[in-house]
Curated annotation (Swiss-Prot):
The modification N6-carboxylysine is found at K220. It is found in: Cytoplasm. Coiled coil: none annotated. It is an enzyme of class 3 (hydrolase). NCBIfam families: PRK13207.1, urease_alph. This is Urease subunit alpha. Residues 132-571 form the Urease domain. Its main location: cytoplasm. GO terms for molecular function: nickel cation binding; urease activity. Its EC number is 3.5.1.5. SUPFAM superfamilies: Composite domain of metallo-dependent hydrolases, Metallo-dependent hydrolases. GO terms for biological process: urea catabolic process. Substrate binds at H222.
Length: 571
């Protein structure tokens, strides 16, 4: 017999459903649930008097071999490039096994996710689930970055470095076969996935190919090592041959040529441009114009996101430290000053909102903050709604188009750029269960639990001597998915196909899985999700004003206050 309850009571029991809205933290952004894959009246939930019990929502006879999942997240609100919807999520063997309706197929109809004796449960009611963030601009300066990044929902690191060397402080590069092998070994117990970038500075292919065969999934070109046209062309020729990505930080000083010369050297080949606005480095003053090229995958680093009253002031000191400059040398100060333009920093926010800039990343400990990639991405979304209004197709109470655009910037798009989207980057069946669970009031700021391959790797946790898990002080701590041998099984290292074919596993110590990064050379900007716009961009060299397709762009105004800020970090 059917039983009717109010929408409010339903929400209290099972969480919001189709058409309901949820405010993201203290921002002006409101998501609206597009569909609900659970069955009204047949929902499952865990706890005393709830449905997941023997003979009810939990099957008591099926074995794991018969398809029972290892873990279920019930009634979750999924926020992903694929949509914003409610569903149960099943996890098995560290992968997403099913998204839909969980329960006991013996007593419930149309079950996609069998729940049984083998199944652990997370109560996803009133919880938002996203894919783990992928940070493509990591300086491997300190292992402490892992925990800091996990605390904001980042589960994959792509970048380079060897520790606190001056080369690493300035450039995201792990140079040469020896360093690449040592860093793969050093990160074998890291609680995040790893992908390394080698040094893309050679006049002949040999030294570059050796680094890729050693396990680098890409090469980085950086002005501090000389962003020459020869280095660009040689790296791209090798990349096209061996299927890896090229990342570039172009020549601020325009010593080796201007922006037009770099574009000519790239010659329509796919490339990932770092901090494309320019404050992080690149052709002054017009590197931002490269974001309009169809073969360019443009990214931002987070110190310029969003544009605030403090952004310009803090950049000078950051530049001096990170790029080994001397404040007593006028030329060094002039070099640093040439990279900082409030006009283009403001436009960067707008280009993110228009889907011209496609990726957000950190530039960890080297002009960026590794624990704020997700947070700052949503701050940009907020200030753009505040200053520019709803996106086309959105409204004051429905920001789904904007939300899908911004979540894609740190999940699926970096995965596509670096050839790992078949494994991570979205909440889809068959992908690694790198999932972040958020309470809506803390969305984008402090996750409830971070799962790595379906295991709890990082979570908020109360006093270990408490009689329950919640007594103060509640702090973030590693959990079982980041301890013991689980550190090697829950996370992976990405390497190119040619490295696997070359037997790189036999040259390394440690038991961590090496998975293939692939298909990086045929992609263009049109393959990126919700962020594929390619307008013609022009920069006035005197005023730094920016035009899109001939129209003057008004950048965001430097904001004085932001959501997701200090009120969340008092304790």
């Amino acid at each position: 017999m059917a039983y009717e309850i109010s929408r409010q009571q339903y929400g209290e029991l099972y969480g919001p459903t189709t058409g309901d809205g949820i405010r993201l933290a203290d921002t002006d952004l409101v998501l609206r649930i597009e569909k609900d894959l659970t069955a009204k009246g047949d929902e499952v939930g865990f706890g005393g008097g709830k449905v997941i019990r023997e003979g009810m929502g939990m099957n008591a006879r099926m074995t794991r071999d018969e398809g029972v999942v290892d873990t279920v997240i019930t009634n979750a609100i999924i926020v992903d490039h694929t949509g914003i919807y409610k569903a149960d999520i099943g996890i098995r063997d560290g992968l997403i096994e099913g998204i839909g309706r969980a329960g006991n197929p013996d007593v419930q109809d149309d079950i996609d996710i069998p729940v049984g004796v083998n199944t652990e449960a997370y109560a996803g009611e009133h919880t938002i689930v996203t894919a783990g963030a992928i940070d493509t601009h990591i300086h491997f300066i300190s292992p402490d970055q892992f925990d800091t990044a996990l605390s904001n929902g980042t589960t994959t690191f792509i970048g380079g470095g060897t520790g606190p060397a001056d080369g690493t402080k300035a450039t995201t590069i792990t140079p040469g076969e020896w360093h690449i092998h040592r860093m793969i070994e050093a990160t074998s117990d890291a609680p995040v996935n790893i992908g390394l970038l080698g040094k893309g500075h050679a006049a002949v292919p040999g030294p570059l190919k050796a680094q890729i065969r050693a396990g680098a999934i890409g090469l980085k070109i950086h002005e501090d090592w000389g962003a020459t046209r020869s280095a660009i062309d040689t790296s791209l020729r090798v990349a096209d041959e061996l299927d890896v990505q090229i990342a570039i930080h172009t020549d601020t000083l325009n010593e080796y040529g201007y922006l037009e010369d770099t574009i000519k050297a790239i010659d329509h080949r796919t490339i990932h441009t770092f901090h494309t606005e320019g404050a992080g480095g690149g052709h002054a003053p017009d590197i931002i114009a490269i974001a309009g090229e169809k073969n360019v995958i443009p990214a931002s680093t987070n110190p310029t996101l969003p544009f605030t009253k403090n952004t310009v002031d803090e950049h000078l000191d950051m530049l001096m430290v990170c790029h080994h400059l001397n404040k007593d040398i006028p030329e060094d100060v002039a070099f640093a000053d040439s990279r900082i333009r409030g006009e283009t920093i403001g436009v960067e926010d707008v280009l993110h909102d228009l889907g011209v800039f496609s990726i957000t990343s950190s530039d960890s400990q080297a002009m960026g903050r590794v624990g704020e990639v997700v947070l700052r991405t949503w701050q940009v979304a907020h200030i753009n709604k505040q200053q520019r209004g709803p996106l086309e197709g959105d409204s004051e109470g429905n920001d789904n188009n904007r939300i899908k655009r911004y979540v894609s910037k740190y999940t699926i798009n970096p995965a596509i750029a670096h050839g790992i989207s078949h494994l991570v980057g979205s909440v889809e069946v068959g992908k690694m269960a790198d999932l972040v669970l958020w309470e809506p009031r803390f969305f984008g700021i402090k996750p409830k639990v971070v799962l790595k391959s379906g295991q709890a790797a990082y979570s908020e946790m109360g006093d270990s001597n408490g009689s329950i898990p919640t007594p103060q002080p509640v702090t973030y701590r590693r959990n079982w998915g980041a301890t013991g041998a689980a550190s090697e099984t829950a996370a992976v290292t990405f390497v190119p196909s040619v490295a696997l074919q070359s037997g790189v596993e036999d040259k390394l110590r440690g038991g961590r899985a090496l998975l293939e990064a692939r298909d990086m050379r045929e992609i263009t900007k049109k393959d990126l999700k919700h962020n594929a716009a390619t307008p013609k961009i022009e920069v006035d060299p005197q005023t730094y004003q920016v035009r899109l397709d001939g129209e003057l762009v008004e950048g965001s105004k430097p904001t004085e206050t932001l959501p997701m800020g200090q009120k969340y970090f008092l304790f």
